[in-house]
Amino acid sequence: MEIFADILPLREQIKTWKREGKRIAFIPTMGNLHEGHLTLVRTAREHADIIVASIFVNPMQFNNVDDLTNYPRTIDEDIEKLTSENVDMLFTPTPEVMYPDGLDKQTVVDVPVISTILEGASRPGHFKGVSTVVAKLFNIVQPDVACFGEKDFQQLALIRQMVIDMAMDIDVVGVATVREMDGLAMSSRNNLLTLNERQRSPVLARTMRWISSQMRRGRNDYESLIEDASDQLRAADLQPDEIFIRDARTLQEPTEETTQAVILMAAFLGQVRLIDNLVVELTTAANEEEEEEEEEEK
C-alpha cells in the first residue's frame, strides 16, 4: 500500500492509474478504523480496480475543541488493517495540507436545507465542514465511486445531494451499518466508552427497534412515540439528545404518502455521543412480510 501525505505525488499516481483505464474507489475516513470501515473497503472492491482510503480528522466539522482533541487516533493500527485488506493507496494529509491558509480563509461548500435540519440544527457548521472536506477530497482523488456508511444517514444524504448539485461524476454507494453482536452500531467513538457504559450501550439500538415495531403496527402519534422512547433511554441512564422520525427520502416530516421512514437517534452515554438510525418500511405488504418473519423467528 502506497501512503501519501501530500497532494501532488498522490495526483501523479492517480493519473497513472487513470491512463491505464483503472476504475478508482475512494473511502474517506477519520481513522480509528473498525469492521464497519473494512466493510466499506470490501464493498468498494466490488465496484473498482483500485481502492484509495484517506485518514484525516477534519477540524472543520467539530463544534467542540475537546471533542476534536479527544478523537481517537490510531494510525499504525489503521495502516495494518488497510494493508491486510489490500488497499492500494492511503492519503494521510495534515490540516496544513488540507487548509494551507487556515480554516477562516478556506472556501466552503454548503449544501442548503440538509445541512441545517435535524442534527445540523444542533451542530451548526458541522455539515458544512463535512461537505467542504469531502468535496476537496473528491477533487484531489478524482474517484469513480465513493463508499459511505449508512450509519451516518444524514451525512450520506448530504453527500449524495452535493454530488448531484455540483454535477460530480461520482457514484456514491451507501453501505449498511455494521453492528456488534449486541446490536450497537460500530463507531470509532465506542472506544471511549467505559466498561459499564459499553454494557448499557445496546439500549440505543433496542429502543430504535421498539420504535420501528410500533410504527409497523400502525402507530403514528410520533411525538408521543418519541417521548416514550426517550423515557426508555433515560431508564438506562442514557441522555437522549435527538430522536427524529422522518421520510427516508426527503428527511422531512412523514406524510400520508410516506412509504419509507427513517428513525434517527442520538444519545449521550457518559461523555460519548452515540448515533444510530433505522429505515422502516411503512407499506402494508412490507409490514405483513416483516410480521411473518418475526413470527418465524419466535
Swiss-Prot record:
GO terms for biological process: pantothenate biosynthetic process. The active site is at H37. Beta-alanine binds at Q61. SUPFAM superfamilies: Nucleotidylyl transferase (SSF52374). CDD domains: PanC. Pathway: Cofactor biosynthesis; (R)-pantothenate biosynthesis; (R)-pantothenate from (R)-pantoate and beta-alanine: step 1/1. It holds the Pfam family Pantoate_ligase. GO terms for cellular component: cytosol. InterPro entries: Cyt_trans-like, Pantoate_ligase, Pantoate_ligase_C, Rossmann-like_a/b/a_fold. (R)-pantoate binds at Q61, Q155. The keyword Nucleotide-binding applies. ATP binds at residues 30-37, 149-152, 178, 186-189. One of its GO terms (molecular function) is ATP binding. It comes from the Bacteria. It is found in: Cytoplasm. It catalyses: (R)-pantoate + beta-alanine + ATP = (R)-pantothenate + AMP + diphosphate + H(+). Keywords: ATP-binding, Cytoplasm, Ligase, Nucleotide-binding, Pantothenate biosynthesis. Its EC number is 6.3.2.1. Belongs to the pantothenate synthetase family. The reaction proceeds by a bi uni uni bi ping pong mechanism. Homodimer. PANTHER family: CYTIDYLATE KINASE/PANTOATE-BETA-ALANINE LIGASE (PTHR21299), PANTOATE--BETA-ALANINE LIGASE (PTHR21299:SF1). Catalyzes the condensation of pantoate with beta-alanine in an ATP-dependent reaction via a pantoyl-adenylate intermediate. This is Pantothenate synthetase. It comes from Aliivibrio salmonicida (strain LFI1238) (Vibrio salmonicida (strain LFI1238)). The lineage of its organism: Bacteria, Pseudomonadati, Pseudomonadota, Gammaproteobacteria, Vibrionales. The gene is panC.
